[in-house]
Amino acid sequence: MPHSLRIGTRASPLAVWQAEHVRAALLRLHPGMAVEIITMTTSGDVLLDAPLHALGGKGLFVKEIEDALQQRRVDVAVHSMKDVPALQPDGLEIVAIMAREDVRDAFVSNTFLHPDALPEGARVGSSSLRRRAQLLERYPHLRVEDLRGNVATRLRRLDEGHYDAIILAAAGLKRLGLPDRITHLLDIDRSLPAVGQGAIGIEARSDDRRTRELLAPLADADTQNCVLAERSMNQVLGGDCRLPVAALARWQGPQMLLRGLVATPDGRRVLHAEAKGSDPVALGMAVAAALVAQGAAEIIEDVRNA
């Protein structure tokens, strides 16, 4: 068993919280281990002047960390699973996904208690085409404007009056000790979450057997299988965190229900599909096929080329 481990993570407060969460879990299992957290800046952290969907490329929030992992500058990478592309680099694998936090999106406003109360032309901040599409489907009178930066930056922009409301992941606010900033939690029927939202993934080198064995007990089997189904759907669609694609898998007794969504960014066309099954990969492929049959591939291609 190794006596030390280096965890690579983004430098944002939320990413560091996630790495500390993994570190604490490891130390509960191995109290004598030295676990170092190494922070680094990713392309997604630097390129803040353009919407995510306009930046191109995949893995905007993970590539530099995965590079460090491949170059053996760190032993483990910790990610928010919604940032991890459907296909991973050769030689790397997600070896554990921890128990999931709240999967829902949070409506945050200093003025309005619910999105239903937002008036014509109200400005809502979000960096996500997925959130934009689902908001505009229900509330076409809103102005959904791009909002980038870490959680504190986004909240500050709201508090400075640049937006009437913003949409954030509930998990991030709760993990940062800011549940009081949540004005209203959006039901998944209103805002289906991103693939892997609320789940922390731990990545290691495929050939590093000892580290993989060390991390395996941190996995939550139910979460891991649900995220696997969501990512299976996303892989077939060729989606990533920049695209208007959503999915959520949940166990219902011995079977899993997977719901999937693909939408045009303006919310005028929103495709839904769902299926039940016990094989996460097959389930994801089935839901993806149902979405493709409705025209999902064309929507995704149009967004990529926009």
Swiss-Prot record:
Gene Ontology biological process terms in this record: protoporphyrinogen IX biosynthetic process
The keyword Protein biosynthesis is annotated on this UniProt entry: no
Catalytic activity: 4 porphobilinogen + H2O = hydroxymethylbilane + 4 NH4(+)
Pathway connected to this protein: Porphyrin-containing compound metabolism; protoporphyrin-IX biosynthesis; coproporphyrinogen-III from 5-aminolevulinate: step 2/4
Keyword annotations of the record: Porphyrin biosynthesis, Transferase
A Gene Ontology cellular-component term: cytoplasm
Subunit structure: Monomer.
Additional remark text: The porphobilinogen subunits are added to the dipyrromethane group.
Name of the protein described by the UniProt record: Porphobilinogen deaminase
